[in-house]
């Protein structure tokens, strides 16, 4: 499989080829996804919820992100790795945005960065792109704005908000973003945006008309039971499989079944006899 990059994402849209993405936060999972042929891996600030146990993504820091981005880039050889910019790492100033985006590329070795917002982050996106760093936008339901939205709610259902989201998409393209994540918006609105902009749209809860799709892998595999978004399709119940394995392990250890001889190391009995005789 050829190495995925920004150009392959853009070419995919022009060739009507769907783009596949998933989130990953560690080496082993990134390696599995990479071997499966995934186009892109997002190291999302969603790690705050699914890995660190936060109630939202707002507490995630740059150090948290860099720690996980480094792990993922070690495991992904062919997938494009996109590093999320956490809350307040780019909103404060254009300078901070470029500096922190640079850390994700330079220290984390990611191939691109992602940040939330449209019109409001136009200058930040433009400056980051000018610094030769590829940017993936993110509009619609933006989790870092959860307090403004009053929760994780579908966005763009009325005319005014729908028009604002369309304008966000246009401005991100104008600023130089190479793609845009559309999250939690009606599929007809996502279709309009996908047809309006020339850069790829990656949907998560935005219907089938986007140029690509992304899911949080814990959601699709049944590994995160705190809540399950409506738009998530289950591709397996790994949570139940893992839970059963843990229970079986606990039972076998308590009952003396594991480890048996098959899982133990052996040595010559004569050596043991000598140790006993010598009082060791």
Curated annotation (Swiss-Prot):
The organism's lineage? Bacteria, Bacillati, Bacillota, Clostridia, Eubacteriales
The alphabetized list of GO BP terms reads: pantothenate biosynthetic process
Q: Which reaction does it catalyse?
A: 3-methyl-2-oxobutanoate + (6R)-5,10-methylene-5,6,7,8-tetrahydrofolate + H2O = 2-dehydropantoate + (6S)-5,6,7,8-tetrahydrofolate
SUPFAM superfamilies hit by this protein: Phosphoenolpyruvate/pyruvate domain
Q: Which CDD domains match?
A: KPHMT-like
Location(s) in or outside the cell:
Cytoplasm
Where does it primarily localize? cytoplasm
Report the protein name in the record: 3-methyl-2-oxobutanoate hydroxymethyltransferase
Pfam hit, one: Pantoate_transf
